[in-house]
Amino acid sequence: MKKEQRIKKNREFSAVFKKGSSMANRQFVLYVLPKEGQDRLRLGLSVSKRVGNAVCRNRIKRLVRAAFHELEGQLRPDCDYVVIARNPARDLSFKEVRSSLEHVMKKAKVLAPLYGNRKKDS
């Protein structure tokens, strides 16, 4: 994901937590905040120290970013997304991470094939 597609600032995370809606499963919590006039989705990641050491936390973040990259064409582009990884996420493979994120995105009604028409920047 490109730098402009990342949520980094504390106030941006806070805005998504306060104004956005949330959906969860055993592995992840997904917060979604629709934003008018935004043409690219933005992603913020949070993995607590309780989940594991730095190597484990960074692995989870890499897997989540890769899953979002694959699903980007099916996601609403006018939203900010924040993913919080829970403890069970540390033992998942990439396929399981992707499947779990797809599940929580479908629950949040942000994953749909109709958003797949937009072009990706390479």
From Swiss-Prot:
Q: What does this protein do?
A: RNaseP catalyzes the removal of the 5'-leader sequence from pre-tRNA to produce the mature 5'-terminus. It can also cleave other RNA substrates such as 4.5S RNA. The protein component plays an auxiliary but essential role in vivo by binding to the 5'-leader sequence and broadening the substrate specificity of the ribozyme.
- Determine if S-adenosyl-L-methionine is one of this entry's keywords: no
What is one Gene Ontology biological process annotated in the Swiss-Prot or TrEMBL record?
A: tRNA 5'-leader removal
Protein name in UniProt: Ribonuclease P protein component
Q: How does it assemble?
A: Consists of a catalytic RNA component (M1 or rnpB) and a protein subunit.
Any one cellular-component term (Gene Ontology): ribonuclease P complex
> Which keywords does the record carry?
Endonuclease, Hydrolase, Nuclease, RNA-binding, tRNA processing
User: Do you know which Pfam families this protein is assigned to?
Assistant: Ribonuclease_P
A GO molecular function for this record?
A: 3'-tRNA processing endoribonuclease activity
What is this enzyme's EC? 3.1.26.5
Q: Which organism is it from?
A: Shouchella clausii (strain KSM-K16)
